[in-house]
UniProtKB/Swiss-Prot annotation:
Glycan attachment residues as annotated in the record: N192, N209, N451
Organismal lineage: Eukaryota, Metazoa, Chordata, Craniata, Vertebrata
Region (Required for transferring proheparanase to the Golgi apparatus, secretion and subsequent enzyme activity and for enhancement of PKB/AKT1 phosphorylation): 519-535
Signal peptide: 1-27
The protein's name in its UniProt record: Heparanase
Gene (UniProt): Hpse
InterPro entries reported in the protein's UniProt record: Glyco_hydro_79 (IPR005199), Glycoside_hydrolase_SF (IPR017853)
Propeptide: 102-149
Location of this chain's protein in the cell: Lysosome membrane; Secreted; Nucleus
Chief location of this protein within or outside the cell: membrane
Amino acid sequence: MLRLLLLWLWGPLGALAQGAPAGTAPTDDVVDLEFYTKRPLRSVSPSFLSITIDASLATDPRFLTFLGSPRLRALARGLSPAYLRFGGTKTDFLIFDPDKEPTSEERSYWKSQVNHDICRSEPVSAAVLRKLQVEWPFQELLLLREQYQKEFKNSTYSRSSVDMLYSFAKCSGLDLIFGLNALLRTPDLRWNSSNAQLLLDYCSSKGYNISWELGNEPNSFWKKAHILIDGLQLGEDFVELHKLLQRSAFQNAKLYGPDIGQPRGKTVKLLRSFLKAGGEVIDSLTWHHYYLNGRIATKEDFLSSDVLDTFILSVQKILKVTKEITPGKKVWLGETSSAYGGGAPLLSNTFAAGFMWLDKLGLSAQMGIEVVMRQVFFGAGNYHLVDENFEPLPDYWLSLLFKKLVGPRVLLSRVKGPDRSKLRVYLHCTNVYHPRYQEGDLTLYVLNLHNVTKHLKVPPPLFRKPVDTYLLKPSGPDGLLSKSVQLNGQILKMVDEQTLPALTEKPLPAGSALSLPAFSYGFFVIRNAKIAACI
């Protein structure tokens, strides 16, 4: 599958590619790379890597108070610029109640905010946080049971809940995308927009800058709520929401959707009819992807190149339908992680999950996905970037490195030779906002699924350029199942409650091969490359 993708991407460019020198037949562990750097393949959004807060966090709004934690905000700020999507299954079971009083935890937080600058205000009290953290495991069990049994109850959220979400996004440098309840229906199954109107009125009165979605995975509405909505009706609902936005202070707000699940059978049919009825009013098409069922996924699945390759076909299906019906429409991964159902216990929150995450980012950029929203930044389940104690997990550090080193311009790279599936390489122009690097530099990111170290040789014009290595490996006795990660041999952890550590490079001697140990991943920045496509 990966070979077919490379043929599709590389096409006639192979003849133009800069290859390794003739006569350098590689041994098993020395690999020659090819780069095509004449022009960018495409550009992705500066917010390409984005994050989500699952709507389930608002089921009991007390737990939204977590978002007042300065530590959590500092971690989110590290991933800016990014979108923050508030959505998920519970989107369609949350109802805004403007008359609902804040919880005691929310009141405690807001009363402490004596500073008019909310982003420089007092943190949530330690006592409140401790109380919530003690109660969170029980709430998490309730949420996961609800998800497994597919028996969802409506909940209400208040103005205070909206304020907490918005202040978290604003103070973290994130752009909030808010998912509206699509299961509020009239007797003839049209969308009932009255509750959305109440929320729009409130957000308008506060001057909030928010983008919007409507519903979550409409292909599974029947399973979740025994309501069947086809693509035509859903498209008409989006047109109605667009009209609502046009009549409000949100006339310039963005609208995204339909947030369908995996592109199979009836879901693809729903997408087609949705795009025909409502495709013109959305700014980007959103869909969701997970590789595996979290309840049965194995470590071997997480390290399988065949599993990674399944993503390619899903992307191709989505792009094909989009191009046919709404050519030129941008496509986003509106929600994605390793395994659905909250992730795979003892896997989705470990170093092993990084292979799926980094490969998905690389393939998405290559194939034309403009934004990838990681489920979830913080919340229930096992696929979060930050755990219940506000400790960053391996995928957080991987995401942070990606943000700092990888720019939006996408280039082509590939491994020379027949077997490319277990050594997966991706190439971008370097992020020019990194103080150490400049226009024209290259960032190569690689994952090695072989059980031996691989030594990579870049094409000859770049072979003598200085290279900085950022190698990620698990830390501690748990190996690939570790929740701790080291960068170039140093364990990554926060310096204090609001300070991220320096991500220190390891410079290589000029002309060195780029070594990547077995079952590891990392980034190589080729400095002073002076690549025209990156200038």
